[in-house]
Amino acid sequence: ANGYDTFVRINGLKYDNDNNLWMTNSGKDKTEGVLNPIKILKSDGKWISLRYPEIAGLNNLERTMFDKRGNFWVISSWIADYGVFCLDTKGTLEDSSDDKHKFIKNFTNQDGTILSHNGIYCITEDKNGAIWIGTGQGPIILNNPSNFFEDDFYCTQIKVPRDDGTNLADFLLAN
């Protein structure tokens, strides 16, 4: 054994607007804690564990954020499990039956191309409410993050004109 057969990571600690402390619990040790990867320490001291099948047992749930709508975003940056998870609790932390949640591994851009990333590294929201995600293929933008849960959801890649008379463009920071 190389010493890495089991591990657990606590990461992405963030407070929500109700002063609840959220965190991720991920790792290679498929214990109950890791299979319930979102933990919340409520402001009253009570712990809540949330389980969503699409991210249960992922190795590296890291960066997190809350958007202006109160949705909780999580990046999985492990090579085999990279992707973005979004959770809308509908304001009911202790009732997950009404939650909307989705994990996207491969995004589709505005041209209908499925992006095969070699990593997802960071996430933030701009002043207009768009979500920016830093990937190994350059930034992608979720201009309407509320549509993340829809089947026909797509992201935008910024195109930089080549200015060589061909009307061709390259994606910003790709390759």
Task: Please report, for each region that a protein language model flagged, where it lies by residue.
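Carboxylate-rich, polar loop motifs that coordinate divalent cations or form catalytic acidic clusters
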Residues: 1-175
